[in-house]
Amino acid sequence: MIHLTGENLKFKEIEKVINHGEQVELSTQAKENIIASRRLIDDLTEKESIVYGVTTGFGKFSDTFISSENLQQLQENLILSHSAGVGEPFSEQVVRGMMLFRANSLAKGHSGIRLETVQLLIDMLNKGVHPIIPSKGSLGASGDLAPLAHMVLVMIGKGEAYYHGDRMAGDKALSEAGLSPVKLGAKEGLALINGTQAIVSVGTLTWLRMKNLLKTADICAAMTIDSLEGILDAFQDKIFRLRPHPGHGKTAENIRRLLQDSEIIENREHKRVQDAYTLRCIPQIHGASKDAHEHIGGILNREINSTTDNPLIFPQENEVISGGNFHGQPLALPMDYMSMAIAELANVAERRIERLVNPNLNFGLPPFLIKDGGVSSGFMIAQYTAASLVSENKSLAHPASVDSIPSSANQEDHVSMGTIGARKALSILENTEKVLAIELLCASQALDYRQPRQSGSGTRKAYELVREQVPHLAEDRELASDIETVEQLIVEGRLVSELEKTIGELK
């Protein structure tokens, strides 16, 4: 059971909730905080005080006073009107992340929402009622309005949801889960949708998968170094003590461990003084992406445990203050940074693939890694596929955050586009997983030709894992299924987890 406080939700806990259905509950202190902030909202509505989003309209309508008899309708209309998203629905994991992160933010007690409303959101999460949320339509300020509105639709008995794998009307999903829709009170609709939880959810899921991707990239690179009889001098620890970026040293250590006891490298047949950059500079290239990953993780963790509402409720001071915590810019820039950091892993991997298949660069391996070249084309078109994915990544890596379009009659005249950036980062990651799968296939094929010399202790294990799934390519066959099989080995984390059982945890 994960206890939500709004202060210290951690990535390991997030993984358990999003991927494994771990149950969630509010801490005692969180409940007290929520009740205290709601008490102030109730006092203000009784006095008919003018407070943005409580007794006024929204956006450009903020100067329109709403009488007490219309406050409930105001909040329901907010959800209905803001449910304007389009496109394919977010995945179940993204939706669960949005629900979890919104509940955690509300747990801090600065949003003025009722305890029973937050509890319904948590009950939906725990029971597996997953609102259908279109993935497009957010500007990333004022928060992720459209995506979160679709989440709240189900809470009020509207919209659609998945329950036990079946798509159904929102009210039916609640009923089958033993839950009842809520009637939103003053400010509650605004409290539920004024946040950055779509950006955070997509970004966090991408970040979590990137951790596995970074280790996978090191494994693939080590296999390519092994199969190309690479020079290990460039990975000596003393080099990285002189330029101590953390990711550089971690990558170099991984490469050394993966290639330990490689007979191919110890008995090199093709002598040279130094390798090309795509081999020699792997610590600097991969390491920079690792440092980016570390930096972005800190930002995501801060945001997950923040209040991103407006206005903010300060019950101790008896204050309600309008601010800009909903603005997604603190996330939009890191999402673009993550896109570039992941794209670079694909860029360098594709160049390593080229070195493996190109007879002018691969030190005695068959052209396109096939013995009967000419009759068979081998991995020629697999490299094309990698090049296509890398080129697509370059387009996707163009920063979303440099764009802004004014909205709400120019009241909201700068927006972050952070949700677009997060979605692009996820697409780049998925493309990069495919590129690494192709490198893994090519490197395994290359290692076949280096036998009987044995590869390194780590690369040998990775090779064995691939060969358990995909046989040597002796003659042309459909490669799409091979790529997909190895991609799943990567995506499911089996490549990394099984290899770490052999050589210990990679950094």
Curated annotation (Swiss-Prot):
Residue numbers of 2,3-didehydroalanine (Ser) PTMs: S142
EC number, UniProt record: 4.3.1.3
Post-translational modification: Contains an active site 4-methylidene-imidazol-5-one (MIO), which is formed autocatalytically by cyclization and dehydration of residues Ala-Ser-Gly.
Catalytic activity: L-histidine = trans-urocanate + NH4(+)
Keywords from the UniProt entry: Cytoplasm, Histidine metabolism, Lyase
Entry GO MF terms: histidine ammonia-lyase activity
Domain of life the protein comes from: Bacteria
Keyword Ribosomal protein: no
Subcellular compartments: Cytoplasm
Record cross-link 5-imidazolinone (Ala-Gly), residues: A141-G143
A Pfam family of this chain: Lyase_aromatic
Family per record: Belongs to the PAL/histidase family.
Protein name per Swiss-Prot or TrEMBL: Histidine ammonia-lyase
Taxonomic source organism: Natranaerobius thermophilus (strain ATCC BAA-1301 / DSM 18059 / JW/NM-WN-LF)
Lineage: Bacteria, Bacillati, Bacillota, Clostridia, Natranaerobiales
